[in-house]
């Protein structure tokens, strides 16, 4: 080999070595798709990853590399006989490969078909006329953006986790941020008219869960499903409107900002503090009613529990199940009457947190055999006064005279003849009344059915 050839090879080797960082920095992510693109949910699909917590993903789009990044695709957890099309956060390496299956479990922050999960061989298609359609294995439509004929040019997953259909001018035609499910990511809004709805459980994703979070012109509210819904969290924001836009909340780095009477670029009406994010972060309304914030810290860690405030865990509607009494985190059924009669038993034996069941169910036709079981020194997580300026006897009689009433909750300050009465139509968990916190006296009277 000539000296010139050796020098040429040496130069090429030196050049490649010096520029190896440039080679490794080339983008390997796949954040967008053109029209007439389709993906099929099969075991052989590319970018499939099984995690040790039982979850599995088949990514269709992924944005970014090295660290926690957003991806979307098919997701399942558990038996994996049904799948969501979802946006989730995963851990990636410098080549945009999905890594850390033992700790970097996918965190779902949006889903399209939570009420209509699909099976193996389901397809996702970005059609030639601009519709994004999810079809189950049998060809039935599980979900669609309904954007056919709206000049869609392509699909993009943004760095903030927003799944966007855009037109030739790059303007948004449809975006997942306008259709929140049970979570918000930084920069995302929840606008009046929208709501977050908790899933039933970690593996039952349907929005038939008990809890919802919404914002309106009065503030931020969390409800448990009932008829009517019962609020277990209220953040009332006073003030006069300085904005013509609808009220909204926005998840920011360091706070949940409440734009109730204002809008950006102005200051929020109020904020709920959240620890500053050092990595990926998101907020989720979960199946137990908690609104938790999670952050990646070499594993997903809870960094805030936003609704657990002054009254603690016992203020959650189903912390002890229906009719059960929560006292310092312990659950128990209401005791016997003064005559020794028992009216409640544990719904699930040896599981007091699963609630209590009436031994004899209430019947409107048997109202003459109904009475009220007094449970002293307890209160309820919500109080929507049904009767004001009243006394305990009028409160009790109002419940006995109303078939739909399941309990009478009476409370007063210093004058028992001038109290308030709440008549819930459904009874969830009851809690001890800590007078040092509530500054009122409170008693519950549970409507029960005599057996004879």
Give the positions of each predicted feature.
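Beta-rich ligand-binding surfaces for carbohydrates and other polyanions
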Residues: 2-452
């Amino acid at each position: 080999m000539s000296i010139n050839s050796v020098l040429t090879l040496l130069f090429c080797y030196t050049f490649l070595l010096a520029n190896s960082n440039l080679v490794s920095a080339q983008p390997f992510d796949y954040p967008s798709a053109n029209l007439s693109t389709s993906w099929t949910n099969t075991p052989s699909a590319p970018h499939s990853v099984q995690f040790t917590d039982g979850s599995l993903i088949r990514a269709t789009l992924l944005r970014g590399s090295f660290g926690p990044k957003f991806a979307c695709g098919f997701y399942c957890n558990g038996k994996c006989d049904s799948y969501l099309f979802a946006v989730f956060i995963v851990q990636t390496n410098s080549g945009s490969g999905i890594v850390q299956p033992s700790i970097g479990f996918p965190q779902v922050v949006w889903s399209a078909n939570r009420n209509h999960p699909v099976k193996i061989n389901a397809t996702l298609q970005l059609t030639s006329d601009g519709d994004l359609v999810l079809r189950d294995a049998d060809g039935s439509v599980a979900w669609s953006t309904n954007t056919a004929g709206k000049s869609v040019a392509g699909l993009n997953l943004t760095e903030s986790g927003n799944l966007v259909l855009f037109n030739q001018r790059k303007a948004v035609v449809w975006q997942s941020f306008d259709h929140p499910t049970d979570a918000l990511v930084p920069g995302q809004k929840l606008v009046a008219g929208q709501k977050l709805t908790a899933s039933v459980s970690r593996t039952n994703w349907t929005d038939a869960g008990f809890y919802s979070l919404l914002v309106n012109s009065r503030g931020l509210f969390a409800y448990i499903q009932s008829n009517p819904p019962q609020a277990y969290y209220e953040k009332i924001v006073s003030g006069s409107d300085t904005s013509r836009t609808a009220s909204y909340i926005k998840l920011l780095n360091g706070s949940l900002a409440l734009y109730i009477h204002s809008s950006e670029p102005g200051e929020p009406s109020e904020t709920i503090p959240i620890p500053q994010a050092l990595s990926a972060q998101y907020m989720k309304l979960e199946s137990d009613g908690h609104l938790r914030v999670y952050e990646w810290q070499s594993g997903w860690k809870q960094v805030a529990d936003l609704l657990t405030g002054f009254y603690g865990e016992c203020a959650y509607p189903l912390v002890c199940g229906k009719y059960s009494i929560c006292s310092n985190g312990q659950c128990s059924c209401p005791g016997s009457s003064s005559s020794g009669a028992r009216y409640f038993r544990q719904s699930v034996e040896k599981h007091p947190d699963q609630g209590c069941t009436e031994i004899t169910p209430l019947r409107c036709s048997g109202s003459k055999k109904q009475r009220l079981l007094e449970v002293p020194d307890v209160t309820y997580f919500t109080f929507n006064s049904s009767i004001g300026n009243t006394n305990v006897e009028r409160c009790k009689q109002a419940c006995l005279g109303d078939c739909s009433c399941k309990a009478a909750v009476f409370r007063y300050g210093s004058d028992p003849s001038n109290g308030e009465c709440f008549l819930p139509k459904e009874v969830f968990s009851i809690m001890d009344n800590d007078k040092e916190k509530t500054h009122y006296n409170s008693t519950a009277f549970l409507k029960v059915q005599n057996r004879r």
